[in-house]
Amino acid sequence: MKKTWLFAVLAVLIFPLALQAKTTVIYHTSDSHGFYYAKDGRGGFAALAGLLKQEKLPYILLDSGDFANGTVEAKNSKGIKSVLMMNALGYAASTLGNHEFDFKDPGVEPMLRAASFPILAANFVDRKTGKQPEYLKSYQIFNVDGVKYAVIGLGHEYPTNETQKFKILKSSKVLDKVLAEVEAQNPDVIVLVDHNSIADDKHGRESTLLKMVTKHNGKINVVLGGHAHKIIQNAVHNGTLFVESGCYLKNVSRITVETDDKTGKFVSATSQIIPLYTQKTGEYAPVAALANALMEPGMDKVLGSASVKLSRMPVKGNQGDSPLNNWVADVCRAYSGADVFIHNNGGTRVDLEQGTITKRDLVNMHPFGNKISQVKVSGKFLEKFVKYGLAPRNLFSYSGLQIEYKLRKGKVQDLKIWVNGQALDKNKTYVVATNTYIAEGGSEGWPFKQIPAADKKQVGDLSIQEIMEKAIETTSPLGAVETGRIIIK
């Protein structure tokens, strides 16, 4: 009798506590870049769909942009195939990454209109009207099993191609305004999807995401970032959880959100990264069938082979260069005839594995259609450019340069540069080549903006992809590529 009474008392005490919390889930991806398919048993939309089918709790699926380009399927369809895949997954919303503008203004609207989910970009307005076009929204309210989610979106402020159609507003000011509008609707959970990162060390611009969010003292509960291809989990700053999910659909973040069952308001959130191993997730058949139907023909053509793996990352601790980026720079300099070729490391997306090299492998490695531009610069400009690109992270690889430096407290010291074996002369003029994107001042190539467009000339008609194809076909098998061009003392 006493035991029965004790259990009854405990039940009365515990049962109300159990009612205090309600759990919903956010799944997050970013920077998928058209990687629809599993590779070596990992990743792809069918694997993600398989995982979602296993979820027992109510969830919302969100994305932080850069879905439009990065593989041949995405590129050839100008992003529309990516949107079709996301439609099939049931994405609730995404935002605009910088690569959503790879196909310039004419490519943006058809791609976004194909989406069955809202594209949230509060900082993008029509340049003529000052208002958002109908295919963009600032935020969206979602009901997730009775929990009122407000999702705000901010697009990337620096598109890969300058836009004449849109005026891009300052994100921090826009966020202040939209957050006030959202709060007036009394949501339970506020989420920001932003194509920006709290740990971007590769694009040569300081991230403002952390500062503009934390000043709101936790009013934004969860921030879902991207752009830097980083994995960030459970980073809490001033009451806000920051999450980033990597790239290429290799992983997904699962954020568990607890809300008070009585008030409905946000209580807490925690995140975990889930690798999309197909043995664990399975591949959901309808999504796999759609992906296969969208596959571009002819991409399995073998171009040649590699006798060793060519890594895009440095292979020795005191070196800032890598075998694959050096190879890209070398074949492009040979084509251009320049003294120096500058290759932006961010343009190399994946390694070239040992074995056969197909057209798909090459496009996945370097998915851009850029050609080569050539310009004459002073040694002084070249020295400043190299120094800027070394810290906090090495942004570029070079053919024709040897670089040595010390890094002290994040600053470059004792920099030494040799151009084709000769010490750099600040007063000498050098012929420098790079891809057209960097030459035009895109992203980390911004120092080239100070050089007049009339002084830049295109070299030949081949794209860098075509140049690499020819190099593989004529020199296969690719062997080991020397490193040690950038030495950290």
Set out the residue ranges of the language-model regions.
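Feature captures C-terminal
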Residues: 23-25, 35-47, 116-123, 139, ...
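Short amphipathic
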Residues: 270-272, 304-309, 374-376
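Hard-cation-handling environments
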Residues: 282-357, 363
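Acidic, metal/ion-coordinating pockets
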Residues: 21-289, 293, 319-331, 372, ...
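Acidic/histidine-rich, surface-exposed loop or edge segments in extracytoplasmic proteins
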Residues: 26-35, 63-65, 305-315, 364, ...
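Bacterial N-terminal signal peptides
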Residues: 8-16
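Bacterial N-terminal signal peptides that target proteins for export
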Residues: 1-8
